[in-house]
Every structure is written in C-alpha cells, then in structure tokens.
Amino acid sequence: MKAGVFFENFGPYHVARLNAASERIQVLGLEWRGRSQTYAWEPFAFGVHFEKRTLLGRDDKCFSNDNLLRCLEKEMAPLSLNAVVVNGWGDFGSLAVISWALKYQIPTIIMSESTAWDEPRKPVKEWIKRQVVGLGSAALAGGTPHRDYLIQLGMPPENIFLGYDAVDNDYFAKNAAVVRSQKSEVRRKQGLPEKYFLASARFVEKKNLPRLIEAYAVYRKSAEFEYAKTEIWDLVLLGDGALRKELEARSLELGVSQWIHMPGFRQYPDLPDYYGCAQAFIHPSTTEQWGLVVNEAMASGLPVLVSNRCGCAPDLVAEGVNGFTFDPFNVQQIAGMMLKVSEPYFPLAAFGEASQHIIADWGPKRFADGLFAATETAIKVGPRRASLLQRLILRGLMLR
C-alpha cells in the first residue's frame, strides 16, 4: 500500500509520525511549502526515513492556490497512490487534494483533531462539513472526542481510527533523563530557576496566559502562608508572540515579574532542557483541538495540569494519577491546582512515571497503526463519488 500524506509543512511531529508509519506502509510525505506559517521551526531535514517532497518551496511568493492546483496535476498522477491522506478540511490545500482525489477516484483519508466543543458550532456550517467529511473513505482522529465529532459529521464509526496526535516519545524521555542527570549545569546554561511550573505555548489569546499569570500571583500569595519561600516555584513561559508585552506588563502589575521567566521560542533540540528541569507542566488554553505540548511533557516524565477545554485531556489526563484538569476561566481553581502539586510531599515522581506510562500508548506507533488500518479500510471502502451538491460545495469552499 502506498499513501500520500499531505501537510502544510513538516515539523518534528510530522517526521516522527511518518517515520513510524513508513515501517508499516509505503509513505510519501508531501508538504505545500518549506516553512510553516504558524511556527518558527527551522527546516527539519534530519532523521527523515520516508520519501518526502516539497511542492512549492520556501519562498512565499511561489505559493498561490493556482500554483498548488497546477502542481497537484503535474506531480500527483505518476505517483500511483492507493490513498491520499489530508489534514482536516478547513484549508485550501486539503480541499484541493480531496478534489483531485475525487477526479482520479483515489480514496481519501481525513485526519482530524476537531471536537464538537472546541469552537462555537453553527448548524449551516456543520451541514457543510458533513458534505465534505462524506467524501472521505476513512479517518484518523486524535482521540476519543475527535472520533465522536467525526461520527456526528457522518463518518461511520468502523472507518475511524485513533492516534493522529503523536510526538516522538523516545526523544523526549531519553533527553529529559539526560538533562536531569546534569540539572545544575543545564539550569545555569538556560538561566532557569531551581523549581518551576513550565508552560509552552504561542503567546496568543486562546492560550490563556494572562489568566495563568493571574493564577500564579494567587498561588504565590497562598504559598507564602503555607511553605518556606525556598519551596515556592517560579513560572517559565516558553514561547513568543503578539501578547508578549501584555504578559510582561501584567506580571509587573501583579508584582510577580521576578519569578516569571519568558525565554522566548526555542527550537526542538532545546526543548528537553526545559522539560527536564521542570517540576510540573501546565496548559491553560481556553480552547485547544489537542495540545501536543502535553504529549511532550508527559513523555518527559512530568505531572500535568491541563485545561478541560483541551482535546487531549479525556485521553491523556488520569485525574489524581498523572495530573489534574481544571476550568481555564477559573483563576482560583488554577491557583489551587498549582498549590496542590507544589506541596513539599506531593508525589511528583509517581505522577511523572504515570504520565510516561499513559503516553506510551499515544506515540508514533499508534499513529502508524492507525494510518495502516485507515489505509486498509479506505481501499476496501473505495473512493467516494461526490454528488453534484458536494462538488458545488467543494468548489465554493475552494474559492473563499
């Protein structure tokens, strides 16, 4: 079996997944462009064990919808694919591949990490989505809530497989362990405090970092009554973005800026330093389709505090075992969770071990198994035939 798997751009996550998948099926990885429009990843070319192609290069001037359509027609026909695999249904690239696959009658597999509750849902838009999802022969979903949403959109349950959202667990586990063996040296190198909560996110509104800073201020005030000052943890916010000045100003306003560290965006090789030196991980998003940083933290052996609005929470967070969930709009609740896990006798190591045990079932192998099963199913089901209405909807969406 040969599957063409499409992403906008390949970062570390995609490479780890497709490397694993290439051990089960023949994988052709295709990216629209050579750099991400969302993440400041450096080009990720090392450790690629599957055939990979960049369709339109790194120059944004080369990227246009017309160029992409021409490229698909020119490049795809000779590849003899048994199935195409697209990342959702919300962007032009995925819709273009679905349209191309319909034209040449090749089964389509839809990868999805959307849930019924990650965004406000409107009946008309949901009806349109059902028409597009109906063009898929199988699906690879992130986890349980993502599967449930695909079923709502009309995908037969027996055609849906799990495991889409995976990171290279071994990379984080091994490198975080190395960092812990030389923690003092790494802390000095990265300018890190002795004990801290770690958050890793783009500095954008949905990541809810202003409330996290407010919660940290409440936590710190409460902790001063409970613990010795040496037992109070700092907060490290890893990432960057448009809200940086607002976050810095809020930290100053609340009188906690000296304990909040913002080292900026860090490339993949640096991440284990921050996970390996942390005591616990916190992810406070008000909405999040999945939350791959939670995978990274768990693979690194950290307890996790995760917003109940994150798509990964139902499958990855076992309450009171490897972490806790919270209402991301409730500052007092977030602060209470921070206070709980930073208690001097809290079993951090046991929670961290539980994290690694849980995430072991949600790594690249699960992605590979899910993609293999989805490809087999898509081939058995065969390519969908679009109604005139579905073709018109697809064309209209591509003209937006």
Language-model segments: what does each one mean?
Residues 303-307:
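Short hydrophobic beta-strand element within catalytic cores of glycosyltransferases
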Residues 263-266, 273-278:
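Short alpha-helical donor nucleotide-sugar binding micro-motif in glycosyltransferases
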Residues 191-207, 213-216:
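Conserved donor-binding/catalytic core segment of Leloir-type glycosyltransferases
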Residues 286:
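Aromatic "clamp/platform" in nucleotide-sugar-dependent glycosyltransferases that forms part
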Residues 245-266:
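Nucleotide-activated donor-binding/catalytic signature segment of Leloir-type glycosyltransferases, i.e.
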Residues 134-183, 192:
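Donor nucleotide-sugar binding/catalytic pocket of nucleotide-sugar-dependent glycosyltransferases
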Residues 319-320, 324-331, 339-346:
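Conserved acidic donor-binding segment of nucleotide-sugar-dependent glycosyltransferases
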Residues 92, 106-127, 135-138, 142:
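A short, histidine- and acid-enriched strand-loop-helix "catalytic/donor-clamping" loop
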